[in-house]
Regions:
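Positively charged n-region of N-terminal signal peptides that target proteins for export
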Residues: 1-5
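Generic marker of residues within folded, mature protein domains
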Residues: 11, 23, 45, 72-74, ...
Length: 390
């Protein structure tokens, strides 16, 4: 059963008392655009956010996310050596962006990840996929399974590198933002380690044998303050696309743009959109990290309820310069929750509504472990429920 709790704390009236302000306006020639505030959960701008489209190399974010997940679980070592199969080299050494791997070469997972993220290597993506799962097909099965687990609902991956495959691989802007958010939130150290390298050197030129250094194609890296990721994409079919992120004064935005006509348009629009997000909108704090937001009922647990905690500082996005405006908050969860529940487990959502934006949704986590009640405890809970004492 869906449970909704309306909040009447001081935070819920933090901005109360003034007439609504018009939401800031933005327009872009990009066919698809999406701007998401990670702190508030607000979608600041959306243009065709759920339209299916080919991702091109932006699919490599999901390839990287699979690797990050395995590394953080201790199931994959960055020092693991991978062999470049001659067949893989033959297919990918001159197909689009390349890391310039050599047939039979031994390459670490660490260097392959740098080749994927920084150089957009199609060859590196497939070599990593085969190294992890045995075949690219088996790896894409892992990509799709993980995508479902992290909330990617309208995308499918048929390749490890996003190369056109007659429509088997498709994504949406909203899903790409979900992948980016997951990487940033769940793997902050790996994100910082791999996604903001300005360049990477691998391979040798033919004849002279000189080192090959390629620049990171990220159009906002080094140009927008706080920019630190994520991934470009381009094919004739997809046009020019980009999923990017930047953090300014503790506030992080994620942007997705696709279907642009040129490299220059991608640079211009990705810079314009994220700068507009930082300039036209502001975050107003609601709850600090670790603050108790509310409680949720628990069924068959050692405790009848569990505190709901802010996993990070939570805020609401409002137009810049607005000192007040109507804000309503409610907690939503499917309940009662069923024990056992682990501390830190995401169990509810805080839904914040303002007069200027669509509902802003951020997660809430359990503040305590709640074990399953023992035999006699369950009998007592049943007794209380029977007589309306629960």
């Amino acid at each position: 059963m869906s449970r909704i709790i309306f909040l009447t704390t001081a935070a819920s009236v933090l901005l109360a008392g003034a007439a609504p302000a018009a939401a800031p306006q933005f327009d872009t020639p990009a066919k698809v655009a999406y701007l998401y505030d990670l702190n508030s959960g607000a979608v600041l701008y959306a243009k065709n956010p759920d339209a299916r489209m080919p991702p091109a190399s932006m699919a490599k974010m999901m390839t990287t996310e699979v690797a990050f997940e395995l590394i953080d679980k201790g199931q994959l070592s960055p020092q693991k050596m991978c062999t470049v199969r001659p067949e893989t080299w033959q297919k990918w050494h001159a197909q689009g962006s390349t890391m310039f791997l050599s047939p039979g070469e031994q390459v670490s997972v660490d260097n392959l990840l740098k080749g994927i993220v920084t150089l957009s290597g199609n060859d590196a993506s497939v070599v990593l996929a085969e190294c992890i799962a045995g075949t690219e097909q088996a790896f894409t099965d892992q990509m799709n399974a993980l995508a479902q687990r992290i909330g990617v609902r309208n995308s499918h991956f048929g390749t490890a590198n996003g190369w056109p495959d007659n429509g088997v691989t498709y994504v949406t802007a909203r899903d790409l933002a979900t992948i980016a958010r997951t990487t940033i939130e769940k793997h902050p150290k790996l994100y910082k380690q791999y996604y903001s390298l300005p360049n990477f050197t691998w391979g040798k030129t033919l004849g002279a044998g000189k080192d090959i250094t390629q620049e990171n194609r990220n159009p906002i890296l080094g140009h927008v303050p706080g920019a630190d990721g994520l991934k470009t994409g381009h094919t004739d079919e997809a046009g020019y696309g980009f999923t990017g992120s930047a953090e300014e004064n503790g506030r992080r935005l994620i942007e997705v743009l696709a279907g642009m006509k040129s490299w220059n348009e991608r640079v211009q629009e990705s810079t314009r959109l994220i700068q507009w997000g930082f300039g036209a909108w502001q975050d107003k704090p609601l709850f600090g990290e670790g603050a108790k937001v509310g409680t949720a009922k628990v069924q068959l647990g050692s405790s009848s309820e569990v505190p709901l905690i802010a996993p990070r500082s939570l805020a609401v996005s409002v137009p810049a310069g607005l000192s007040s405006g109507n804000v309503q908050m409610k907690i939503h969860y499917d309940g009662p929750l069923v024990a056992p529940i682990a501390k830190g487990q995401e169990v509810a959502q805080l839904v914040v509504t303002t007069s200027d934006t669509p509902p802003q949704v951020v997660p809430l986590v359990a503040g305590d472990d709640v074990g399953r009640a023992g035999f006699f405890g369950r009998i007592w809970l049943g007794f209380k429920s029977l007589f309306g004492m629960a």
